[in-house]
Amino acid sequence: MMQAEPARAAAASAPIEIELMTWTEVKAALAAGKTTALFYTGGVEQRGPQNATGGHNMMARPIVKAIAEKLGNAIAMPVLPFSPTGMSADLPGSFDLPADLLGTVLERLAEDAIVNGFTTVVLMGDSGGGQGPDGIYASVAKKLDDKHKANGARVFYANESYTKANREFSDILVKEGFPPGTHGGILDTSLMMYLDTDNKYVRRDLLASAVGDPVRPRGQKPEPGYKPVNNGITGDARRSSAEIGKRFFDHKVDTAVKQIKALQASR
């Protein structure tokens, strides 16, 4: 029994981010059952005056690592640093990777993961570009799943850590009396504050003025004469906090794990 404890401790502390693993560690992890590859895309885009443009990448890394840890049978692949996004010279700092190019990259990397020995590949994204049932993630996942499932490998698109978790937690905050917000709003800013332990990504001195254009129902036009703020924020981020960010982080991870487990069970 005494000998088993160090082995358990070593397994628990073993790296699960493939960039931090040697090839022998990857081989051992695959042999031990960590055969799910998690691909999570980030992005570089303007996120309001208070948030650095690399927020998607900063959030994606710990999120996908936590998902892998909680699943127990997964390894986090390197975060892809670019994704489809809008661009404007008025708000510089965004870099758009068109959906077709992202699809080519995802397809190649997913097939490489299968060649390496992974039997399940999961595609996820931290940004909205290319997501949804008709988006590039879903398209690539279906194409590769149809191609490889007869040989025992599956490829899935897991969207709920973005779409479902964001919607649900936004509703929770609104019920608690917080303002609604989407891009650069209270959700994004709070999550970045929670993860930004080195104070590199969030300009906390600008939070007091971090309010942008209001969240409107889809299709609703601004009132006549309304002058857009156009600062990269949709909503009101002034009450953002690391405490809210921690709750949101946990909700995103739990939502992703639940969906991925359901997808794995469908094998």
Which sequence ranges carry the predicted segments?
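Extended, histidine- and acidic-residue-enriched regions that form the cofactor-binding/catalytic faces
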Residues: 2-86, 90-100, 104-122, 126-267
